[in-house]
């Protein structure tokens, strides 16, 4: 509901700087404005040369360019939304794994606490793995510094945590405190976590083909550099401002597509709120543990 309210104020959204691509594209917009100004000055100083072009081709080219930019933005959004769905799966599977472990696992309080804490560790480790960092303060709080150091030293941290979860379940089966059918059900939930992080890694390590960006940006450059020649006879000295007016949405849409392509990078404006998501998972599974402990005491 808080996010819903945040998008209701038209004026605050229209003039927002934080979270906007405007600071990123404004230098480029200004550059095209300067180029247009130089073209207008050259036209004014050199009257014997005809620098003018017809407007009609730019109307067609503008429509084509707009379509390409929308497709580019949609491609970026599809990647962003797929990443969000995968993290939604991690949220749900973490809850399911905690519920299944507490329901079918041993009644030993130490085992249950250890198992749930390893579950709470997984999303933090997955987030850090996707962001290429091995600083694990949340894991230190959950499992202690020694375990956090072991996880940080692992080649693939999410797989290490998933392995420890599987070992914890296997120990319960070996001790006769968990039957095989229950183990298979709970381990199925655990395996799903690896499937989801694998999907996230596929997105993170497979950028859109660079040739796609090169062609679109080359088209943008040619369109905006030559646009002033079509405007000179129409708007005169206002040509630089009209060029900038056209350049802003064009370059902004291009940048939006770039920002949405990397949903896990904190350097991108459109990155997923993984800190909040992982904290939510930790809180949810630890709450389940507390509820279970209170029920055991009754």
Regions found by a protein language model. Give the residues of each.
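N-terminal juxtamembrane/topogenic regions of multi-pass membrane proteins
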Residues: 1-92, 107, 233-237, 264-268, ...
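Transmembrane alpha-helical segments and their cytosolic interface motifs
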Residues: 23-32, 201-233
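Pore-lining and gate-forming transmembrane alpha-helices of multi-pass membrane transport proteins
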Residues: 63, 230-254, 258
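Intracellular alpha-helical coupling/juxtamembrane segments of multi-pass membrane proteins
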Residues: 80-97, 186-197, 203, 267, ...
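Alpha-helical membrane-embedding segments
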Residues: 87-99, 112-130, 274-289, 296-298
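Structured inter-helical modules in multipass membrane proteins
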Residues: 98-212
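Long amphipathic all-alpha helical oligomerization modules
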Residues: 212, 227-231, 238, 257, ...
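A hydrophobic, small-residue-rich beta->alpha segment in the mid-to-C-terminal subdomain
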Residues: 247-250, 256-275
